[in-house]
UniProtKB/Swiss-Prot annotation:
It comes from the Bacteria. It is an enzyme of class 1 (oxidoreductase). The keyword tRNA processing applies. Catalyzes the synthesis of 5,6-dihydrouridine (D), a modified base found in the D-loop of most tRNAs, via the reduction of the C5-C6 double bond in target uridines. Specifically modifies U20 and U20a in tRNAs. The gene is dusA. Its cofactor is FMN. One of its GO terms (molecular function) is flavin adenine dinucleotide binding. This is tRNA-dihydrouridine(20/20a) synthase. Keywords: Flavoprotein, FMN, NADP, Oxidoreductase, RNA-binding, tRNA processing, tRNA-binding. It catalyses: 5,6-dihydrouridine(20) in tRNA + NADP(+) = uridine(20) in tRNA + NADPH + H(+); 5,6-dihydrouridine(20) in tRNA + NAD(+) = uridine(20) in tRNA + NADH + H(+); 5,6-dihydrouridine(20a) in tRNA + NADP(+) = uridine(20a) in tRNA + NADPH + H(+); 5,6-dihydrouridine(20a) in tRNA + NAD(+) = uridine(20a) in tRNA + NADH + H(+).
Length: 345
């Protein structure tokens, strides 16, 4: 799928090459989020920021190798885009990494941070933190077969294995034996039992200073920080200590914060994306998807928070929530919802 003129108009910049270097884009990224960062969401977020590195939802190696659907599908406009893999079999991960590189992904990320039960049962996610050698083997197997970056997203500890020494040993093993050069650190530990994934994102306390210390102790590694970051001001404060910042829920629930990322984080001279123009720039994509059988609500559910903090935001959200799922719903639903915002502006 190729870019449309609306998208090019919004994302015009002379400072960055057409396919942004992933190391540069890693200064600011949107986290992989299950059920949220699907291809429709990523297309939408790309209209708000040209440079932000976007991540897929976690995709398991089993789904890619044995699944019937195309779990690697994405639009060319999404670049730079990284694939997050879930798995713990080095050979299967290597196979999937090769497929992903052939499809044009800019980075492969291994999930060593998700604490959900269904993930643990498949022996991947945060439970892998307890087996640093296996994580190293997985990363090395992927690095041996691809030339794009292979990164690891992890936590600062699991259960009672939460000492700084444990974290350093993990990073040491995965960077040394696994040759991993880039880590994204969620600044909380994970409880592998007793807490839901949602609770694991909220209850374990954030420890940003520990992540800063990790970067100081491993200056040769590229490290991004993740967890509880709610504004670009906070992101810029973290960038005083870290190579990159990854934002999760806030970028999804209040995507308008991405509109200023290119200027504030990447130094672009472009004007910030206008939310109304972004909605209308979605129309060609939406019409193409509708013609292929996608329901409007599957796309617009990612756009509900766009006008957060702007008069009319509640009416926008409510109208889309009540009408986008109806049979025959098309871009007229969005046009009507936009009028509700415009009337309040």
């Amino acid at each position: 799928m190729h870019g449309n003129s609306e998208m090019q108009k919004i994302n015009q910049t002379s400072a960055m090459p057409e396919k942004t270097d992933v190391h540069w884009s890693g200064r600011f990224s949107v986290a992989p989020m299950l059920d949220w960062t699907d291809r429709h969401c990523r297309y939408f977020l790309r209209l708000l920021s040209r440079n932000t590195l976007l991540y897929t939802e976690m995709v398991t190696t089993g789904a890619i190798i044995h699944g019937k659907g195309d779990y690697l599908a994405y639009s060319e406009e999404e670049h730079p885009v990284a694939l997050q893999l879930g798995g713990s079999d080095p050979a299967a991960l290597a196979q999937c990494a090769k497929l992903a590189e052939a499809r044009g992904y800019d980075e492969i990320n291994l999930n060593v941070g998700c604490p959900s039960d269904r993930v643990q049962n498949g022996m991947f996610g945060a439970c892998l933190m307890g087996n640093a050698q296996l994580v190293a083997d997985c990363v090395k197997a992927m690095r041996d077969v691809v030339s794009i970056p292979v990164t690891v997203k992890t936590r600062i500890g699991i259960d009672d294995q939460d000492s700084y020494e444990f974290l350093c040993d993990f990073i040491n093993t995965v960077s040394g034996k696994g040759e991993c050069e880039m880590f994204i650190i969620h600044a909380r530990k994970a409880w592998l039992s007793g807490l839901s994934p949602k609770e694991n994102r909220e209850i374990p306390p954030l420890d940003y200073p520990r992540v800063y210390q990790l970067k100081r102790d491993f200056p040769h590694l590229t490290m991004s920080i993740n967890g509880g970051i709610k504004s670009l001001e906070e992101a810029k404060a973290h960038l005083q200590h870290m190579d990159g910042v990854m934002v999760g829920r806030e970028a999804y629930q209040n995507p308008g914060i991405l509109a200023a990322v290119d200027r504030e984080i990447f130094g672009s001279s472009d004007t910030d994306a206008d939310p109304v123009a972004v909605v209308r720039a979605m129309y060609p994509y939406i019409e193409r998807e509708l013609s292929q059988g996608t329901y409007l609500g599957h796309i617009t559910r990612h756009m509900l928070g766009l006008f957060q903090g702007i008069p009319g935001a509640r009416q926008w959200r409510r109208y889309l929530s009540e009408n986008a799922h109806k049979a025959g719903a098309d871009i007229n639903v969005l046009e009507h919802a936009l009028k509700l915002v415009a009337d309040k502006r």
